[in-house]
Amino acid sequence: MPKLKTKSGAKKRFKVTGTGKVVYAQAGKRHGMIKRTNKQIRNLRGTTTLFEGDAANVKKYFLPNQR
């Protein structure tokens, strides 16, 4: 049986670290930031780790070759 293909949308959104955690960029910084405070915008910077249950599903179904 051939290897499963990685979902191309998922490989743009998620990254698996060396320790196996899944990180992603937070949503909400594309447009409409005039109504947000500077603190809210600042807190959306950088990447965040997915919760373990969600990370397991992402690795199983969307990133099968990244385990």
Curated annotation (Swiss-Prot):
Q: Which UniProt keywords apply?
A: Ribonucleoprotein, Ribosomal protein
Q: Give the signal peptide range.
A: none
- GO CC terms, sorted: cytosolic large ribosomal subunit
One GO MF term on file is: structural constituent of ribosome
Coiled-coil portions: none
InterPro entries in the record: Ribosomal_bL35, Ribosomal_bL35-like, Ribosomal_bL35_CS, Ribosomal_bL35_sf
* An example Gene Ontology biological process: translation
Identify its protein family: Belongs to the bacterial ribosomal protein bL35 family.
Q: What is this protein called?
A: Large ribosomal subunit protein bL35
Gene that encodes the chain: rpmI
